[in-house]
Amino acid sequence: MNCLYLDGAAGVDVRKNYAFTARGREALCRRFLPLGGLVPVVTCGRTELYFPCPRADAERAFSAFLKERAACAREDNAQGSGAAGFSFCGGREAVLRLFRLAAGLLSMLRGEDEILGQVRDCYEFSRALGASAGMDAAFQAALACGKRVRAETKISSLACSIATLAANAAFRFCAGGNALIVGATGKMGGAVLKNIASKGGWKIVATSRSHAFAASAAGVTAADYAERYAFLDGADVIVSATASPHTVFTADKAAAALRTQKPRLFIDLSVPPDIEAGVADIPGCTLLGLDGFRAAAEENNEKKRSAIAAAEKIAEDCAEQFFADEAARKCAPALAALPEMERKSLYALRKSDAAAFCARAEALLAGKENP
């Protein structure tokens, strides 16, 4: 298995071009079917492509997909220029990366829980399309690793979330006031809503495209998404956390809606961004995007260094055990041909020292050990 990835090391202005919608991910998976399949892991912080084919074949297929996508202009955010900005890792390194990803060790906030569900959803998406063949075992083992890390370490209990950081930014901006939250029915928007509502001293307008949405918390008013600009002028803090591929707040419309000049904090938790960068140029307005939370995330990560180290060890052990299981499967006929005592010794080695077992298994496959 190999991996092409674009993560938080690239700014949101780059990542937004590869924030594929479900339609885009389906088309990309189908493009890779003749090459053996693909599992694209797409979140607000990364786009990672896991595939069994050689790197060169994957890069050609990915570049061709992006060119077609841009040409038809029907797929939103069709601006990716190819795989040039993506990093690559292959074989054992790619598998270990997947395990660390599921464990939350590659997240901006180490150990956050959401990534495990995101990896699972992306894997299930590809599996439903028949695009995960040959990678099922790796993804299932990675998901099990992610669960084990959270069960055996304190990394999740010590972790906060981007939603918590966003709420804290709102609290630092003003002790209380009026908040407008767009995308309140999503996981991120809903978490921000809950955090701000629990603080007290806030009046919240929560908008959603869903007609089924109803505000239940005290001090929360439900509004239709189409009315979002009408509530801007009264808001002190505006949080946008939608999955929309389109701009939610343009600078021109926001400026026209803001009749009262006062300090306002806009928080954009989406990739691609919901809020046009020009909003920051409106007098009194401050714009904070996802990448603006990195300093706060690093501060949180420092508090759980020992838990991170323990999680890294578990991820490495899980990966080695996966490699040992795969090696045992590949050399099963050679193992079966060994004398009973030697075979039992190797199976015991598989449990006690997975790396050493892999080395012996590779030697068997290469014919360097004769049954």
Q: Can you describe what each PLM-predicted range is?
A:
Residues 18-19, 254-265, 269-371:
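Adenosine-phosphate binding glycine-rich loop
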Residues 51-59:
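Helix N-cap motif at beta-to-alpha junctions
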Residues 181-182:
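Hydrophobic Val/Ile/Leu positions in short beta-strands of Rossmann-like dinucleotide-binding domains
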